[in-house]
């Protein structure tokens, strides 16, 4: 199926109680729309439409390829179960699922529309190094929400700077559960994985039966590493063959506390047993350790910034939206 055949729902389309305004983004599994409800509140709506195995008919219904009906339905159930689980989570650091329903032979998830900027945009917009205080606060707060996600037997599996939003009040919110699945279920290995090189754990490449909270913790470590370097770490599958990752304790020793750098390096351990085993233990370490005293920006800082021009972190129009679903950074 050509992706050009997968036409998004048009502007003005009435989807139950919601009117479609525009497409925010699209990815391998879904479209995300900006819409308004009957009270004119702005929301984001995610539609399950895996482009490799299904297309949209003229009457807006989604039709799987004849050979892929079973796979489509498996993914549909996964998406629906994900909506059920996320709808139970009412946490300020997790994007709020307001509603989910079936229509057009597929499933829709209605989410709160967030205003602010992605962590990716924040990192690239800084004139100096991202402060240790900011890193500890953002990831400490985000850990509260991620603990709730793990309590629901869900994993995110695509945590990265583009999927963390910084609201106008400075609080972080975790977006885009496009890779989230009932990750403790055996059926998941059969559905195509979706992850971002550099931020995905080794288990996501090699043995999905080993997935657990420690897999999201690897991605948290990689995202904190990106705060230091403005680039993503080397991909885990490349690291296993030839580990060229420069440890955080070496990279950031003049600018960040030893304790923070050690936390980042432990999260990025290739062996999942060497990482923090729960978000609670990671959060405890982040909140207990003392940051270095604040320093004024120096010439060295400016040189470090110049040398660490963004390589893999790129802005796209979709990532300026409050909800994103892309597999790039």
Each model region followed by its residue ranges:
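Protein kinase glycine-rich loop
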Residues: 21-27, 32
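AlphaC helix of the eukaryotic protein kinase fold
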Residues: 57-88
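Activation-segment/catalytic-loop signature of the eukaryotic protein kinase fold
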Residues: 100
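Conserved short submotifs of the Hanks-type protein kinase catalytic core
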Residues: 104-118, 122
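Activation segment signature within eukaryotic-like protein kinase domains
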Residues: 138-139
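Protein kinase catalytic-loop region centered on the HRD/HxD motif
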Residues: 142-154
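C-terminal lobe helix-coil module of Hanks-type protein kinase domains
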Residues: 198-294
